[in-house]
Design a protein with these regions (language model features):
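A generic structural signal for well-ordered coil/turn residues at beta-strand boundaries
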Residues: 28-29, 72
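Short beta->alpha transition motifs characteristic of CBS
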Residues: 48-52
Length: 141
């Protein structure tokens, strides 16, 4: 299966910062991104902000369906917590890598382990916590 490198994760986090426009101006919104996973880099394919974190996820899921995008080589980023619902939605989209700047719930953790999603939380700048799927993550060390 696919692997995610620390360099690609850092590239994603750098690019997400450039996209959070409503959040920078007003706050109180969640952002979600669908990104490529290309070796040592990552490009954002789509970015959605909404007051409801589920709305932002669903907008990306819908766009993936309309554009017939395969999730197997993608990374999903959310500003929201890694809940069971977020993990299930990522699994339904076929995305193996789930990244958030927030934390996780116990149920989200358990489901991610069960379905084989690599889940990374508290991801900001050069800091992150790898919660599940460590075998598919390559750090720079």
């Amino acid at each position: 299966g696919a692997t995610l490198t620390q360099s690609a994760l850092y590239a994603l986090l750098d690019r997400v910062r450039l996209h959070e426009t409503i959040y920078k101006q007003a706050g109180a919104v969640h952002g979600c991104a669908l990104a490529t996973n290309e070796g040592d880099t990552s490009q954002i394919l789509m970015f959605v902000e909404d007051v409801g974190r589920h709305n932002a996820v669903d907008a990306i899921a819908g766009r993936m369906w309309l554009d017939r995008l395969d999730g197997a080589d993608k990374i999903f980023y959310t500003t929201g917590r890694l809940t069971s619902e977020m993990v299930i939605k990522a699994a339904q989209m076929g995305i193996p890598f789930l990244v958030s700047r927030s934390g996780l719930t116990q149920m989200g953790f358990e489901i991610a382990q069960k379905v084989g999603i690599t889940m990374i939380g508290r991801a900001t700048n050069k800091h992150y916590l790898l919660f599940t799927g460590g075998a598919r993550f390559r750090s720079a060390i």
